[in-house]
Every structure is written in structure tokens, then in C-alpha cells.
């Protein structure tokens, strides 16, 4: 793995619009801009890879820009995430779909403002709060400036409403609808091609390989924070709606528009 990438992932600078040329050279930007049916893709765990493959089956995509986003809460082997991009290259080259080199993006300060700073306030105000909702919102919002830079109107995400019958608060219908509506404000589509895939076995079928959920991906220090002690899912949907309507939408829009004006 490139030491320059490792340095970025160690320091996690504000990296949303001004990318180093070794990562995103002008020649690559030019090629991406002139490529029709280009998509910016989320690269994280198993579902994100399956989502890209399914998206290429459902849409006439000609090129993928894989993006790896950081917050400040991940831990584990980053190399695993980048290695999975080779799965895409291997699977998509036969269909003449280009997979560009990955772009790393992130802003822990933006994440903190959106997800961390007001934890106590939101818990008291709404009676429920989970960082996971804002975190996944951040993951989609933070890709908007890059997509705009590349004249790309499509972002692919790997969210699913059900995971073998289990719910994740950041992937319930209310959350996913909110993510998609936010990108629409910027003239973009957040495409969730596996949104209604419930079975993990179907995900493995799309991947054409065994890959258990949660394996071969980074961990998060806040994982499962919305679960009760015995493991049941606990959340207040009304609290999530208010979080978006009263805070997250406005905060994220102001932040993203500020980045776009730079």
C-alpha cells in the first residue's frame, strides 16, 4: 500500500476538494470529466462492492471512481479496503468498464460537527441519538464535492434496509430516504442498487464469492451503539426525522456549499 496513502490515513486531514496530484492528477480529472455514464462509488465493506457490481448490471455505466472515506472512528487494516477494489477491476474489465485509481476523502472536523459535538444535546432533546445515522449521512455528503468536480451526477452506495431480517438504524427507510433527498438538492442521485436485498446469501451471489457480513473490513469504535445490552435494536424514528430536519440537513448543506465555493 502506498506510503502516501498511509500518511493521509494516519493524519486524516481535511481532504474534500483539494486533492494531491499524485492521487488525482489533472489528466485523470480531464479523463473522468469527459467520460459518459461515470459514477462515484463508495468503497467500504462487502455490501459496497456488491452495490457497484449490481449498479453496473442495472445502469449503462462506463467508468467507476472508487472512493474511500474516513471519519475519525475507524480502526483496523486499511489495506483490506483498497484490496477489494481489485475485485471490481477484475469483474468489470470484461464489460469494458473502467475502474479508476481510488480517491481518499474525509474531514473529521465535518464528522465531529455533524455527528459528535451535540451528542448530549440531541439525547436530551430527542430522547434518542445514535452517531451512526449522521455518520452514514456524512459518508454520502462528503462525496458531493468530488462528484461535482468530476461533473458526475451519480453516487453509488451499499446501504440495505434489512440484513437477514436485522435492522441497522443508519439504514432504515427514514435514513436512506434522507440521504437520497439530500443529494437531490445538489442535482445528484444517490443510487442504492441493493437497498431491498435482504439476504446475505444474495449479496454473496452478486459477489460470486463467499464473504461473511462484517468480515474483511474496518471496525468502528462506536459500532452497535444503538443496541440494548441484550442485543436488540432500539431507536426512535421520530427522533431521527427531527435530527435531519432540525439540524443535519442545514448543517451539512452549509458545510458542503462552503467546500464547493472554495
Predicted segments with their positions:
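Nucleotide-activated chemistry modules centered on ATP-dependent adenylation/adenylyltransferase
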Residues: 2-262
Amino acid at each position: 500500500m502506498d506510503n502516501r496513502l498511509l500518511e493521509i490515513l494516519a493524519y486524516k486531514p481535511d481532504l474534500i476538494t483539494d486533492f494531491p496530484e499524485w492521487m488525482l492528477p489533472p489528466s485523470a480529472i480531464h479523463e473522468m470529466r469527459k467520460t459518459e455514464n461515470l459514477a462515484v462509488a463508495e468503497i467500504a465493506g462487502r455490501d459496497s462492492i456488491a452495490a457497484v457490481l449490481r449498479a453496473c448490471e442495472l445502469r449503462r455505466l462506463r467508468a467507476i471512481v472508487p472512493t474511500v472515506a474516513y471519519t475519525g472512528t475507524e480502526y483496523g487494516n486499511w489495506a483490506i479496503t483498497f484490496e477489494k477494489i481489485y475485485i471490481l477491476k477484475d469483474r468489470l474489465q470484461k464489460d469494458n468498464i473502467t475502474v479508476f485509481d481510488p480517491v481518499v476523502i474525509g474531514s473529521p472536523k465535518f464528522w465531529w460537527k455533524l455527528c459528535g459535538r451535540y451528542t448530549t444535546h440531541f439525547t436530551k432533546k430527542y430522547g434518542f441519538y445514535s452517531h451512526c445515522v449522521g455518520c452514514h449521512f456524512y459518508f454520502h455528503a462528503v462525496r458531493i464535492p468530488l462528484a461535482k468536480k468530476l461533473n458526475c451526477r451519480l453516487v453509488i452506495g451499499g446501504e440495505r434496509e434489512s440484513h437477514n431480517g436485522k435492522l441497522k438504524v443508519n439504514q432504515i427507510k427514514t435514513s436512506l430516504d434522507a440521504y437520497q433527498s439530500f443529494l437531490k438538492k445538489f442535482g445528484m442521485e444517490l443510487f442504492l442498487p441493493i437497498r431491498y436485498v435482504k439476504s446475505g446469501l444474495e449479496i454473496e451471489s452478486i459477489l460470486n464469492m463467499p464473504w461473511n457480513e462484517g468480515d474483511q473490513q474496518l471496525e468502528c469504535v462506536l459500532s452497535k451503539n444503538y443496541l440494548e445490552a441484550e442485543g436488540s435494536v432500539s431507536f426512535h424514528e421520530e427522533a431521527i426525522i427531527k435530527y435531519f430536519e432540525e439540524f443535519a440537513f442545514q448543517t451539512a448543506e452549509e458545510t458542503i456549499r462552503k467546500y464547493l465555493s472554495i
